[in-house]
Amino acid sequence: MSDRIDRDVINALIAGHFADPFSVLGMHKTTAGLEVRALLPDATDVWVIEPKTGRKLAKLECLDSRGFFSGVIPRRKNFFRYQLAVVWHGQQNLIDDPYRFGPLIQEMDAWLLSEGTHLRPYETLGAHADTMDGVTGTRFSVWAPNARRVSVVGQFNYWDGRRHPMRLRKESGIWELFIPGAHNGQLYKYEMIDANGNLRLKSDPYAFEAQMRPETASLICGLPEKVVQTEERKKANQFDAPISIYEVHLGSWRRHTDNNFWLSYRELADQLVPYAKWMGFTHLELLPINEHPFDGSWGYQPTGLYAPTRRFGTRDDFRYFIDAAHAAGLNVILDWVPGHFPTDDFALAEFDGTNLYEHSDPREGYHQDWNTLIYNYGRREVSNFLVGNALYWIERFGIDALRVDAVASMIYRDYSRKEGEWIPNEFGGRENLEAIEFLRNTNRILGEQVSGAVTMAEESTDFPGVSRPQDMGGLGFWYKWNLGWMHDTLDYMKLDPIYRQYHHDKLTFGMLYNYTENFVLPLSHDEVVHGKKSILDRMPGDAWQKFANLRAYYGWMWAFPGKKLLFMGNEFAQGREWNHDASLDWHLLEGGDNWHHGVQRLVRDLNLTYRHHKAMHELDFDPYGFEWLVVDDKERSVLIFVRRDKEGNEIIVASNFTPVPRHDYRFGINQPGKWREILNTDSMHYHGSNAGNGGAVHSDEIASHGRQHSLSLTLPPLATIWLVREAE
């Protein structure tokens, strides 16, 4: 019988260098009849078994002591179901032969994957528990077109790459194999001989769960059930909705006090979710929770884009957290990182021995600042991997929005590069046309497939139309972070009040471009690290003035057009920079009422008042929703404006950014009547000096600032006040 199989083929198969195992293993028609061949290292005896009766049909002959068996089934001409009875170390085991099953991926799926238009590639690629021909197991599929051989290794086969080599689908470059008996919870990887002949162990790019660092294996895990979007969650993302985002790093929001260990997803559901709800926030934004090897990356260098990190629990635990947030009325935003990935050898880098996911030229494919690799967006399968991932988090976990990280680094080829360190596009320009098309396509698909979910761009340049529709030349994001506003206003606030009059335009300039994008006003994690100090510590003056400045700034921010974002700890004025390895300084809220409690109460009241009054959020992106009343009083550092809703109801916002109270400050108004003070950052409730206007003030028919009626107010020191007109 040995003449039927070439000895070189057997040697290559056993050595793990044979690329087409299905041409040899399994059941085949030969001139001698139906022949079954199996590679079973360490086996001593093998029989072909009839599943229904358990009858032994034939004993396979050992053609190679390293585990290659073959035998002809007598009196059989047509293929049939069979099992193998295998003796290992004196123990007989009944197994199903992986090599008796046909191709796994349907032709249409293979076509769409190759074309890069498969909306949900994760439903085909990766590891999926399945039943084939009555046999339960797991089907594995991985894209590695340049690999010479790929095997599945894991807890089900002693991590032995000889035991389960995969079938290559040449039309798509995908390797596939159904392994009977492999089940949810088992660890696995792909072992491959790469394009250069090197042996590699790779995690599954499409793994739904992964081991916690420093381990790097993937886990077989069922695809999560779809989460249905609700109308309430859709409405909470709309342009006219109040959006106040609490940005959180799950690993350092709060830790166990006895061992400084993280809270689990379920503990966070029980503690973080009710806290954010009580504080009045509408959205939770999570720094990336994709699996990542390095804690210090904060999640922004992911290796498991489809797997929630195991640091805080399982995939189901994360689903529990999301469900708890939704039950509390909070939408969830996930920081999403399609811009780059780390160089770790177990992940995407040189996946099949070639630059499969990244560009080959480091001038296109390497981030010097972060020591990471840049996705090749022009490769259809790569962009499909990323677009599918966006849909995956929204559809399978109920994520309500994706905040896309570092967009500027994606859309500019010369981002953080000197001359000669980057390659122009085909037209000689600096724009990364493939990345731009990828972002437009992603936003288009999300708009079509999961209407109601939105995307937000962290984009640090003046690239036009980031949050404008694709048919208008835009990128199609729903919102864009206003980093210019953030830098200008923080630069202003850190000044001694005596010098602020010379930088008045830092607070007014934002309105000159306010309606070019749909802006979010971010005080994010990036502003409290790397020596920048905390937001509180940037404020000038003694302790009283620092807190007063911060309260005035928050009052200004919550009133200014744009959605709001505040990083954790800033809501109670944490004094030190953020440390990802430690809990927030919750002890600042212990030991009785203090300034930190005052800021915390203010942020809560800002959220609740902002949400209650439509004028503060309904027309953020419509010029009718805002009007300056006093814009040029730079000598006294006073700014006053109106926020307006669709029905014309107004709220007056007045800020005094000096420590000098301004008594009898008169300015013109649009609507005469009684104006009630609904928020005062100088209130004693927030540990201010309690200067103000006695709760309400009536307008006078005295012309001022070109208007027939006016108000005369007391503007408290270093404070912002909000007033609403009461009905007659």
Swiss-Prot record:
SUPFAM superfamilies for this protein: (Trans)glycosidases, E set domains, Glycosyl hydrolase domain
UniProt xrefs under InterPro entries: A-amylase/branching_C, Branching_enzy, GlgB, GlgB_N, GlgB_N_E_set_prok, Glyco_hydro_13_cat_dom, Glyco_hydro_13_N, Glyco_hydro_b
Please state the Enzyme Commission number of this protein: 2.4.1.18
Pathway the protein contributes to: Glycan biosynthesis; glycogen biosynthesis
Q: Which reaction does it catalyse?
A: Transfers a segment of a (1->4)-alpha-D-glucan chain to a primary hydroxy group in a similar glucan chain
Which residues are the active-site ones? Answer: D405 (nucleophile), E458 (proton donor)
Any one GO MF term held by the record is: 1,4-alpha-glucan branching enzyme activity
Example of a GO cellular component annotation carried by this entry: cytosol
Functionally, this protein is described as follows:
Catalyzes the formation of the alpha-1,6-glucosidic linkages in glycogen by scission of a 1,4-alpha-linked oligosaccharide from growing alpha-1,4-glucan chains and the subsequent attachment of the oligosaccharide to the alpha-1,6 position.
Q: Which NCBIfam families match?
A: branching_enzym, PRK05402.1, PRK12313.1
By sequence similarity, the record places it as follows:
Belongs to the glycosyl hydrolase 13 family. GlgB subfamily.
Q: Which HAMAP family match?
A: GlgB
Q: Which PANTHER family match?
A: 1,4-ALPHA-GLUCAN-BRANCHING ENZYME
- Which named protein is this? 1,4-alpha-glucan branching enzyme GlgB
Q: Which organism is it from?
A: Escherichia coli O6:K15:H31 (strain 536 / UPEC)
